[in-house]
Amino acid sequence: MKRAVVVFSGGQDSTTCLIQALHQYDEVHCVTFDYGQRHRAEIDVARELALKLGARAHKVLDVTLLNELAVSSLTRDSIPVPDYEPDADGIPNTFVPGRNILFLTLTAIYAYQVKAEAIITGVCETDFSGYPDCRDEFVKALNHAVDLGMAKEIRFETPLMWLDKAETWALADYWEKLELVRTETLTCYNGIKGDGCGQCAACNLRSNGLNHYLANKPAVMSAMKAKTGLK
């Protein structure tokens, strides 16, 4: 039996990954992390979606220690979430240091216990927003370290790594779940479900990608298929 574990936040990217995994694996588990994030509604959204989409199990892990260590606008109410700035340089204050290191490592421990062969994460280098822990080289390096530390091969899969946001929408549409992803996921840094606040970087990236996809469906769908190998 082919098993996979999805690192699941209830946002657009991880939900699209879950949808695809459910078509490609016999059994899919989800792991969501409570790290004291600013908008805890995402945990409730993740629970609802994991149940609705048919995950075999959904584990919510308490990692609130991360909140004490990682200072970010996503973990501190006192730090305002910035509006979208198209020419911004450097690492944004929405970056949570160590988050993906911790999430992927703990998910690997869970995957080891349930005998899953793969961990699926929705990180993306094309639209990585300045987050160093969304880069392909980081994921591959951590995957290698985890395999060595567990003396077991657990594959880290990143199906969105080379897709832009329009192509990620195309992937959701390919699996006939575009409307669900648009209306029922929570990607907004200000904690607003669906189309979000329309002001933060996450909402801007998401809406621009959707608009581009809807205006150029055949071309974007073709590009997505070429990158993913889907027919």
UniProtKB/Swiss-Prot annotation:
Residues that span the membrane, as ranges: none
Cofactor: Zn(2+)
Binding-site positions, Zn(2+): 188, 197, 200, 203
Catalyzed reaction equations: 7-carboxy-7-deazaguanine + NH4(+) + ATP = 7-cyano-7-deazaguanine + ADP + phosphate + H2O + H(+)
This protein's UniProt keywords: ATP-binding, Ligase, Metal-binding, Nucleotide-binding, Queuosine biosynthesis, Zinc
Record pathway: Purine metabolism; 7-cyano-7-deazaguanine biosynthesis
Listed GO biological process terms: queuosine biosynthetic process
Gene3D superfamilies registered for this protein in UniProt: HUPs
Binding note for cofactor: Binds 1 zinc ion per subunit.
PANTHER family: 7-CYANO-7-DEAZAGUANINE SYNTHASE
Protein name: 7-cyano-7-deazaguanine synthase
Organism: Enterobacter sp. (strain 638)
